[in-house]
A protein has these predicted regions:
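Conserved ABC ATPase "signature" region
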Residues: 5-23
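ABC ATPase nucleotide-binding domains
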Residues: 117-145
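Conserved ABC ATPase signature
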Residues: 3, 27-31, 35
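A short, surface-exposed alpha-helical micro-motif characterized by mixed small hydrophobic
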Residues: 90-92
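A short, proline-enriched helix->beta-strand linker immediately N-terminal to the Walker B motif
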Residues: 46-50
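Catalytic Walker B motif of ABC-type/P-loop ATPase nucleotide-binding domains
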Residues: 52-56
Length: 145
């Protein structure tokens, strides 16, 4: 019926948005880890949520697909809560971040205010340095034990 056709359109749009149309007829078990990750994000988008909670949405993805997924979810007209362990990626992709240590909040706010050398060093017990990269003129965190 009409609902089935609408559902098919929604699924098709989610697959298209994540460049997964070529995988539509494949079994999940035949896909690579990165392909499966993208399928799971598309599956969540097909539900048309207002709030999307993603646990490591870039895990198992090559850098191009990481950037594509983050750009895609950033452009969605909904609230996204995502766990990302790559602090530089989180800084570039997120409006606000929550820095946790052992399940406790160390800070919440804009990435530049939260991902300071002092706070990141404290959270992860590493030496942290914020450096400006040339020629992009972007800031980047580096770490040492």
């Amino acid at each position: 019926g009409a609902n089935g056709a609408r559902d098919a359109q929604i699924v098709q749009a989610a697959l298209d948005r994540l460049c997964l149309l070529e995988f539509a007829d494949r079994q999940l078990g035949t896909l690579s880890g990165g392909e499966r990750q993208r399928v799971m994000v598309a599956r969540a988008l097909a539900q048309e949520p207002r709030l999307l909670i993603l646990d490591e949405p870039t895990n198992h993805l090559d850098i191009r697909h990481q950037l594509e997924v983050l750009a895609l979810i950033r452009d969605l007209p909904l609230t996204i809560v995502a766990s990302l362990h790559d602090l530089n990626m989180a800084s570039a992709a997120c409006d606000d971040v929550l820095l946790l240590q052992a399940g406790r909040s160390l800070g919440f706010g804009q990435p530049d205010a939260i991902f300071t050398e002092k706070m990141v060093s404290s959270a992860f017990r590493v030496q942290t340095c914020r450096e400006r990269l040339a020629p992009s003129n972007t800031e980047h965190l580096t770490f040492k034990l």
